[in-house]
């Protein structure tokens, strides 16, 4: 399951951001996840719940924002979101084989952190 390695990298990113912002903990982690990213949201959530326990994210909530597929026509350049399961042609000019330009991504969208107490 590659979700484990993804969560490990995600937690490392969170640790780095918390350290550079002098935060004592991360309370919310928001991830953008394309519907064609190849990552299972439920497995990602499960792995996060287990791996976060020994990190700055121990008490954090994981929010996954699903990003839809987006296509660009190779002929007319139109960008569109597919309607239904037939996305083999441009919805504007009907040319075949549009390019998938969105929905494959996965990235850290935002973090909510709690600052260290100043003393």
Swiss-Prot record:
Lineage: Bacteria, Pseudomonadati, Campylobacterota, Epsilonproteobacteria, Campylobacterales
Binding site for Zn(2+): 73, 76, 90, 93
Organism: Wolinella succinogenes (strain ATCC 29543 / DSM 1740 / CCUG 13145 / JCM 31913 / LMG 7466 / NCTC 11488 / FDC 602W) (Vibrio succinogenes)
Superkingdom assignment: Bacteria
Record InterPro entries: HypA/HybF
Positions annotated to bind Ni(2+): 2
Chain's role: Involved in the maturation of [NiFe] hydrogenases. Required for nickel insertion into the metal center of the hydrogenase.
Keywords, comma-separated and alphabetical: Metal-binding, Nickel, Zinc
Protein's UniProt name: Hydrogenase maturation factor HypA
Family: Belongs to the HypA/HybF family.
Gene Ontology terms: biological process: protein maturation; protein modification process
Keyword Metal-binding: yes
Entry GO MF terms: nickel cation binding; zinc ion binding
Record carries keyword Zinc: yes
């Amino acid at each position: 399951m590659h979700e484990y390695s993804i969560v490990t990298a995600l937690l490392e990113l969170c640790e780095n951001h918390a350290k550079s912002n002098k935060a004592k903990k991360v309370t919310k982690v928001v991830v953008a996840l394309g519907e064609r990213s190849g990552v299972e949201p439920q497995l990602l959530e499960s792995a996060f719940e287990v791996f976060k326990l020994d990190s700055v994210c121990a008490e954090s909530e994981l929010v996954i924002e699903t990003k839809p597929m987006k296509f660009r026509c190779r002929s007319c350049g139109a960008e569109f979101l597919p309607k239904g399961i037939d996305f083999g042609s441009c919805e504007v000019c009907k040319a075949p084989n549009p390019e998938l330009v969105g929905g494959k991504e996965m990235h850290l969208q935002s973090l909510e952190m709690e600052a260290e107490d100043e003393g």
